[in-house]
């Protein structure tokens, strides 16, 4: 996360308060964006009013230097707007809302490692992997998409009040027989997330890094997460998915969850067998602000916004 601090705001609060706020940002490894004048003001405030721990922290802090890549993909927060909620914003872990966290979280937490040698975004995925390993990004079990908007509302009005949109990414299955249909069963969820219903929503509302409505979320382009595992991985577990391959709607939109022998608890095992090449072989490509990326890369960049 990048915290933007203006000189006017830095000067408007006590030096002790400024020292405490900046030390908190530094301690959790976030970036501080400011001009040179403001940086000197912050450093002097910590030097003159901060504790020895805060002063020592400032001496080793590297977060004033922010790459263009970080500015492009990390979330930027204006401290003046979130001054009263900074502690909550910094200290509470970010959450990934998952339909079945018990089995699917193994997949999501392994993706940054699987993509660690990614040529386009390896620095961003390294930050993401580090955050997950440190439990700064954790799973939130949704129990099915029907409960999502209620769970999001609840968190947004209680423990994560005023900051949850920046601390959560919701992910769920498409659950349709093709790539052009959006399920009316998800109308309440779609409307909550972006103000549109199934008949109005477009790919550009979903497969982007700047989503309308303020929430960060992702709906799998294929029918469900199961459709991203290739046939041979299922065969390794003794599950024959030939019927999916020969179906009218094709492998990507067949309900693999109903195939005889398949169980949801196989997802962690399937995930452990996947390589980057396995995921990229038949994945959808998107053009995001002139940059071509795969759906998995896009999903991981949505997770990066939580770092």
List where the protein language model places each region.
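Non-catalytic accessory regions outside enzyme or core folds
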Residues: 1-53, 300, 307
């Amino acid at each position: 996360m990048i915290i933007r601090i203006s000189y006017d705001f830095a000067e408007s609060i006590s030096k002790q308060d400024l020292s405490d706020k900046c030390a908190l940002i530094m301690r959790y490894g976030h970036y501080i964006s400011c001009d040179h004048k403001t940086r000197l003001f912050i450093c002097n405030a910590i030097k003159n009013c901060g504790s020895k721990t805060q002063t020592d922290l400032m001496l080793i802090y590297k977060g004033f230097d922010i790459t263009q890549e970080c500015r492009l993909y990390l979330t930027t927060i204006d401290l003046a707007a979130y001054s009263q909620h900074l502690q909550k914003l910094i200290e509470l872990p970010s959450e990934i809302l998952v339909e079945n966290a018990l089995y699917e979280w193994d997949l999501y937490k392994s993706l940054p490692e699987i993509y660690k040698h990614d040529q386009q975004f390896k620095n961003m995925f390294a930050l993401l992997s580090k955050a997950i390993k440190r439990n700064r990004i954790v799973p939130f079990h949704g129990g099915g998409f029907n409960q999502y908007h209620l769970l999001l509302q609840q968190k947004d009005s209680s423990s994560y009040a005023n900051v949850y949109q920046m601390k959560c990414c919701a992910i769920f299955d498409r659950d349709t027989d093709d790539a052009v249909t959006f399920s009316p069963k998800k109308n309440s969820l779609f409307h909550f997330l972006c103000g549109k219903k199934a008949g109005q929503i477009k790919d550009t509302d979903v497969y982007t890094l700047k989503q309308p409505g303020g929430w960060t979320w992702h709906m799998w382009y294929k029918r469900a997460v199961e459709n991203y595992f290739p046939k041979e991985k299922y065969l390794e577990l003794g599950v024959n998915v030939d019927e999916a391959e020969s179906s009218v709607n094709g492998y990507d939109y067949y309900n693999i969850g109903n195939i005889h022998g398949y169980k949801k608890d196989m997802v962690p095992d399937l995930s452990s067998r996947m390589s980057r090449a396995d995921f990229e072989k038949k994945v959808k490509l998107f053009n995001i602000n002139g940059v071509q990326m795969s759906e998995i890369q896009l999903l991981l960049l949505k997770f990066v916004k939580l770092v």
